[in-house]
Amino acid sequence: MPAIALVGAQWGDEGKGKATDLVGDRVDYVVRYQGGNNAGHTVVIGDQEYALHLLPSGILTPGVIPVIANGVVIDPAVLFEELDALTARGVDVSRLLISANAHLIMPYHRALDKVSERFLGKGRIGTTGRGIGPTYADKTARAGVRVQDMFDPKILRKKLELALNDKNQILTKVYNRRALEVDRILDEYLGYAEKIRPYVVDTSLVLNRALDEGKTVFLEGSQGTLLDIDHGTYPFVTSSSPTAGGACSGSGIGPTRITKVIGILKAYTTRVGSGPFPTELEDEWGEWLRSRGHEYGTTTGRNRRCGWFDAPIARYATRINGITDFFLTKLDVLSGLERIPVCVAYDIDGVRHDEIPMTQTEFHHATPIYEYLDGWNEDISQARSFDDLPKNAQAYVRAIEEMSGAPISAIGVGPGREQTLELRPLV
């Protein structure tokens, strides 16, 4: 059976948790393959809302095996906080599997992330301050601490001593902060070791064997394509690869095993943090979208920047990921608009660009070129088929589909599990 990748097609917060929840009972494994607790998934089941930051959304579906794979960076304190919270609400968390090769977020990563962002002032990137970037930096520099290192106190102490020789110099001499102690961190993480041990396996081996046995593996990305370290709006990006390519390296599954790539698109556009955003609305319409769509970060609580749908970005995501199907979310938010602007291209210094420009300088100066589609007044939150939608809502979906370069196979018309129109099977 296939592996299926789920990717955000914008700047994150597109509704990936809703998509995972929709297909959760049709798959056998749900895998987080990158990022950490710097992103949030919100899943609504009946009258219960669950906000997950690190755990795969599939942990909420009985019988599904949730996996935190090698490409994820783990803050053990956050991990056990989420596990304990779900256990208290009656969720079985014993099925969770964690890669021995996943890297750990250490106290010095969080400390450096926070002070360096403040030090940058107006040049800040907009990090969540949770240590994600410094952890990936150490991973790339071959100086990171992995889950498996917690099981050998000698190796863990040696790695901590080497790390703090460097990190404490930066904390004390550059940022005038207090030095961190090896023994205190060692004791804390050795305590985590015994709690995490029952979950730790070779996740790549488990997932590939599952595929060999005909099981379905669902690879759940966090953030979005435009936040990818290689393909995003650099440097205003995350430190990992939330694209379909990242799903392979972050899970240990080969590219030929992924047979479908589902891109999640919001019916408008949002972004958290700094960086270019051509369709951003800094007026009453931006506040209208924010209020209607409840656009506040699951992880940070920060206001999301809001704007109209950006077709060049959607086409870019299709190209970068090889998207085969789109899931369009939050269509219901647009109800009540007489006309809906859609960005179809950019004007840069008087020249039309139908695709995302090559340089960030050009992207910063891009002005959206809009086409206007007729809106609708009806409440569509009770729609249960495409034919239930008003004609203008149907036309909006078809226009977005044509502009984005891949079929829209599902539509979200509200936050609930049942508020989804599946035009063709996603799994």
From Swiss-Prot:
EC number(s) on file: 6.3.4.4
Xref: InterPro entries: Adenylosuccin_syn_GTP-bd (IPR018220), Adenylosuccin_syn_Lys_AS (IPR033128), Adenylosuccinate_synth_dom1 (IPR042109), Adenylosuccinate_synth_dom2 (IPR042110), Adenylosuccinate_synth_dom3 (IPR042111), Adenylosuccinate_synthetase (IPR001114), P-loop_NTPase (IPR027417)
Co-factor binding comment: Binds 1 Mg(2+) ion per subunit.
Binding site for substrate: T298, T299, T300, G301, R302, N303, R304
Catalytic reaction list: IMP + L-aspartate + GTP = N(6)-(1,2-dicarboxyethyl)-AMP + GDP + phosphate + 2 H(+)
Chain residues that bind Mg(2+): D13, G40
Binding site for GTP: 12-18, 40-42, 304, 330-332, 412-414
CC cofactor: Mg(2+)
GO BP annotations listed: 'de novo' AMP biosynthetic process; IMP metabolic process
NCBIfam families: PRK01117.1, purA
Subunit structure as annotated in this protein's UniProt entry: Homodimer.
Protein name: Adenylosuccinate synthetase
